[in-house]
Amino acid sequence: MSDDTLIACLATSPPPLLAAYAHLKHEESVLVTGWRRTGDEEFMVGVRWPAAFGDLPYDPRLLTQTIRQSGLLVAHAVYEVPLTHQTMLDTLDFTVAPRFRAPLGQPSELDVRVTVEETAGNRRAGSSLHMRIHLIRDGVTVARAETEFRWISPRVYRRVRGDRLTFDWGSWPVPAPVAAELTGRASAADVALAPGDGPRRWLLRNNTGNRLLFDHPVDHVPGLTLLEAADQAAQALLAPTRLVATRITTTYYRYVEFDEPCWIEAAFLPAPAPGLCAVQVTGTQSGKEAFRVRLGGVAREGGDAVPPGDAVTPGDAVTPGLRAY
């Protein structure tokens, strides 16, 4: 389906409503543009990415935000999940076409196919939704994800978080970042890592001025922010070589708090195949492991351009196992 056909068929919503569905305060952070039903449990979502810059083939933050926003849009607009409920992302594993690259210097349009495979609880306001998500550009699938969204009521969430629920937003110190080029990012404002106390070890840097990572006040570090920090740690580990990640799996063990240091460590894993590399990144807070991310893909010298192509095929199976909060 062409972009023009999709846009013509999309069930458009006012920008403020799309922002609410995506749990975002700032409309400029909203990537989803509308949706339409294509089957009993299948939907097509329109997505617009801003212009890409830098030496990475795509912005990992836009990829993960696309998955998140598309799933939330379907959950709220179609399945009527209450906006007052807290979202818990139980699983998020994805693969990316090895040669996918966002066009440099110009916005790009994507189609996102969301298939809801199973629903637990009441269908119209279910406690969980299992989704398969395909990102499509020019009719070709360039990324696939499998995820499960869960929701809990405000009352239950208050019980879970206790006295951590209220927090003086932005009151923590923000240390100076590592060099942006070390992480493959375009500017210091995008860097989520600060120098650590040893090699391959960094301090998580929670800069609330980065709206793509911190759109609005929350009581714990968002899971996608931790995933972004892990990607940057993998880039720093390989620098000046760049990791073009094609498979990512993440496990979250506990909430990461703002008022305690969180240490990020990266290490090489055995290569899964000739020409490929794998990295494991762990986050530790108060002496306990808080999350773990494994990234696999191709290392490319000096951020060489990766031409577009190579669709994700059915053989590129996603690996279950992510628990993200």
Give names to the regions the model predicted.
Residues M1-D55, R150-F214, V306, V318-Y325:
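Non-catalytic linker/capping segments at the edges of enzyme domains
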Residues M1-I7, D111-A176, L269-Y325:
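HotDog/MaoC-like acyl-thioester-processing domains
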Residues I7, R37-Q86, R200-A236:
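Hot-dog-fold acyl-thioester-processing enzymes
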Residues V32-T33, L89-T91, H130, V142-R144, ...:
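Hydrophobic residues on conserved beta-strands that form the core of alpha/beta folds
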Residues D40-M44, E109-D111, R144, P199-R201, ...:
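Intrinsic-disorder/low-complexity, polar/charged segments enriched in Ser/Thr/Lys/Arg/Asp/Glu/Gln
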Residues L73-T115, D231-F268:
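Hydrophobic beta-strand-centered segment that forms part of the acyl-chain substrate-binding groove
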Residues A188-W263, A278-T282:
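Acidic/His-leaning functional-site neighborhoods
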